Regions:
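Acidic/histidine-rich catalytic neighborhood of metal-dependent amide-processing enzymes
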Residues: 103-148
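Membrane-interface loop-to-helix entry segments
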Residues: 99-101
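Acidic/His- and Gly-rich active-site-bordering loop/insert found
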Residues: 2-97, 106, 110-121
């Protein structure tokens, strides 16, 4: 069963490339958080921004008893100069998404779109974690209490 439409896939690619062009270091992911929040809003998913400074947490709640699952994507880029020559290469000097976090964000937004339409029972918590690259973002997400 193919549940990822061509349109959703293309939208995920656009999101990934947009984030890739404008990478942000740990705890500076404000533009990335705004993109995430807007995309989730478009899907009808309420998100809480500013978690662990620049993180975003959202919940897909079916109102039906079932398992609670958390899905996580890291958001931050690293301090390295991109020299790929890609049309969507980083426009920020000395900062790049070399670890794929731009793709992780796009994929979690895509998963959210699918789950919002297909989840029948239980809940899914969507965690967009800042500062994964050694800056303690995961600990700050845990301390926020939003995963309780």
């Amino acid at each position: 069963m193919n549940i990822v439409s061509k349109e959703l896939f293309q939208h995920m690619v656009r999101i990934r490339r947009q984030i890739h062009k404008h990478p942000e270091l740990g705890y500076q992911e404000e533009n990335t958080a705004a993109i995430i929040t807007e995309e989730l809003k478009r899907l009808g998913i309420k998100a809480t921004a500013g978690i662990a400074k620049t993180g975003v947490v959202a919940r897909i709640d079916t109102k039906q008893t079932g398992p609670v699952v958390a899905l996580r994507a890291d958001m931050d880029a690293i301090a390295i100069q991109e020299e790929t020559g890609l049309e969507f290469a980083s426009e920020v000097k000395g900062v790049m998404h070399a670890c794929g976090h731009d793709g992780h964000v796009a994929m979690l937004i895509g998963a959210a779109a699918i789950l919002k339409q297909s989840l029948k029972t239980g809940n899914v918590i969507l965690v967009f974690q800042p500062a994964e690259e050694g800056e303690g973002g995961a600990q700050k997400i845990m301390e926020s209490g939003l995963l309780e």
